[in-house]
Design a protein with these regions (language model features):
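An amphipathic alpha-helical core segment
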Residues: 108-158
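An N-terminal structural lobe/cap that precedes and organizes the functional/catalytic core
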Residues: 1-100
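Single conserved hydrophobic/aromatic residue that forms the stacking wall/gate
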Residues: 169-179
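Charge-dense polyanion-binding interfaces
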Residues: 86-121
């Protein structure tokens, strides 16, 4: 969560996160659909461990990613309201555009675009709330999710964070206070 505007938020992802977070956001949205609209069942991992799974009653079941870390703060935040989901979908859409701009190809997660555009049927209606900071405690700023994520980038991610030359990017007035 690097900017309140979903397009600018996508733009502000460093190169490594443009690649990595597209997958994680698709997993979050897939998990929201499965947890909210699916039927719980138990499966077994290859090692025999019992796994919680959710089966969707329609073709999404064979298309969407499996549910992951359903109690992770980001997953809980996403399922709290339709506006949280819509914000993440918009940011993810723009992040996919960012990926194409920076790397000259389409990310494989784009195959999920039309299946994730709709909110889960059973998601509560509500206002957007800033994402819950999912980071070490020392980076969290009470009541300031945006500031927390900027601090996290500065203190914990600065060693690898770099941005491709973005001088021609379509967004005006980029803000990267953590550089």
């Amino acid at each position: 969560y690097l900017h309140k505007d979903p397009q600018k938020c996508a733009y502000e992802h460093c190169d490594k996160h443009v690649v990595k977070m597209i997958i994680e956001y698709a997993q979050l949205m897939s998990t929201a659909h499965r947890v909210l609209d699916g039927e719980l069942f138990f499966d077994k991992a290859k090692n025999g461990r019992k796994l919680r799974r959710f089966r969707l009653p329609d073709d999404r079941d064979s298309i969407l990613m499996l549910s992951v870390h359903e109690n992770h703060p980001s997953n809980i935040w996403l399922r709290q309201s339709d506006e949280n989901y819509k914000w993440l979908w918009q940011m993810w859409f723009h992040l996919n555009r960012e990926y194409t701009y920076r790397y000259g190809k389409t990310h494989s997660c784009m195959r999920l675009l039309m299946n994730l555009i709709h909110t889960p049927k059973n998601i509560p209606t509500g206002k957007f709330t800033p994402p819950t900071p999912a980071m070490p405690e020392e980076c969290k700023i009470a009541g300031d999710s945006l500031g927390s994520y900027h601090k996290y980038y500065i203190e914990k991610k600065n060693y690898f964070a770099k941005w491709t030359d973005l001088s021609l990017i379509h967004i005006s007035e980029p803000t990267r206070p953590y550089l």
